[in-house]
Swiss-Prot record:
It comes from the Eukaryota. It catalyses: S-ubiquitinyl-[E1 ubiquitin-activating enzyme]-L-cysteine + [E2 ubiquitin-conjugating enzyme]-L-cysteine = [E1 ubiquitin-activating enzyme]-L-cysteine + S-ubiquitinyl-[E2 ubiquitin-conjugating enzyme]-L-cysteine. The keyword Protease does not apply. Changing P61S: In ns770; Viable. Inappropriate survival of male gonadal linker cell; exacerbated on a heat shock transcription factor hsf-1 mutant background. Residues 1-147 form the UBC core domain. It comes from Caenorhabditis elegans. The gene is let-70. This is Ubiquitin-conjugating enzyme E2 2. Gene3D superfamilies: Ubiquitin Conjugating Enzyme. Keywords: ATP-binding, Chromosome, Cytoplasm, Nucleotide-binding, Nucleus, Transferase, Ubl conjugation pathway.
Amino acid sequence: MALKRIQKELQDLGRDPPAQCSAGPVGDDLFHWQATIMGPPESPYQGGVFFLTIHFPTDYPFKPPKVAFTTRIYHPNINSNGSICLDILRSQWSPALTISKVLLSICSLLCDPNPDDPLVPEIARIYKTDRERYNQLAREWTQKYAM
C-alpha cells in the first residue's frame, strides 16, 4: 500500500511539481526522499535553497511522513535539528494530503511564521517584538547557510 502510494506521488510530482519545490527518492530507497525548497520571493529567505529529508513510515499515508530541514534556517517554527512545527505533520495529518501539499505548506510557513506555536521561543519573541531584526537575522542565516 505505502509503496504504491509513494510511487504515485512521485509520478504526480514529476507531472505537476509544486512552485519553488522539488522532491524525489535518495538512490533506490523510495521511503527516503530529499526535497528542496527555494526561499520564497518577498521573504527574508529569498535566494536561498533549503534541503529537507523526507522519511515515509511503512503505514503511509495513514501516518504522516517525517520531514526535516537539513539546511539551517532562522525561523520560529523550525529548530536547530531541522524539526518543523506544522500541524499537518502531526495532529492534523490526513491520508488525503500529499508530499506536494506538505511542501507547499512548508513554503507558506516560511512566508507566514506562526509565532504563537513556536519551536524556538526566542526567535518567536523577536518576530513578534522586532520584525526588522527578525528579517535581518533570517536574511543573514539564509546567506550563510542556504546560498
